[in-house]
Amino acid sequence: MTLSSHVIGSGSPATFLHGFTQTSHSWLELVEHLPLASTLVDAPGHGESADGQRSLTQIGDDIAAIMPTGCLVGYSMGARMALHTALQHPHKVTSLVLISATAGIRDADERSARKNSDDTLANHIEDVGVTTFIDEWLSQPLFAGLNSATNQRQDRLRNTSRGLADSLRFAGTGTQEPLWDQLRDLTMPVLLLCGTTDTKFHSVALEMA
């Protein structure tokens, strides 16, 4: 699958992967201020990359096929995709930035429960439609500090209910095989980031480091 992408700016190459319900446009306000040639990618099931029926392994190949050799940056869902890309195609990734990342759920029962939860949410998205779901999604405490100018609601509404649902079914956290034992195989510099109040991913980042 050829993912939709576009390049902003000039300079050293860097590729950016957004989180669930976002699109490549979510990075615009940031990358416009960076001295980089930034490749902004629509993940499968998001934006102009409408087909969400891609596994994380397939997505790693898809990203490597379109990105220039350089830095790879991913947030949340995009961080999991970036990690797969770096492990599968290390020659394409000179440095790796993972924001709110995880290397997967180790426990098989917990992973299965998360897969069931992701599937239930996917069905719900298709039942209620993208507008209702995005409003539900943005009402979570995680986004409490955002307002209409910063929550990117209009951009998120560019997605489709089918695309988001398939993204969860095929590449949700519950589908990810644990990559903890493979972290030692990363040969490029890696930067792990999380929000100052994000205690969950702060703990995960410390464990991944």
Where are these regions (language model features)?
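Conserved HGGG/HGGXW glycine-rich cap/lid loop of the alpha/beta-hydrolase fold
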Residues: 3-50
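Conserved serine/cysteine hydrolase catalytic core
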Residues: 159-207
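Short beta-strand immediately N-terminal to the catalytic nucleophile in serine-hydrolase-like folds
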Residues: 72-74, 99
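Flexible "cap/lid" loop of the alpha/beta hydrolase fold
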Residues: 87, 94-125
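Conserved acidic catalytic loop of the alpha/beta-hydrolase fold
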Residues: 57-71
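Active-site signature of alpha/beta-hydrolase-fold catalytic machinery across serine-
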Residues: 29, 84-88
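Gly/Ala-rich beta-loop-alpha elbow adjacent to hydrolase catalytic centers
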Residues: 74-78, 82
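Helix-loop "lid/cap" segments that line or gate small-molecule binding pockets
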Residues: 119-125, 136-147, 167-174, 193
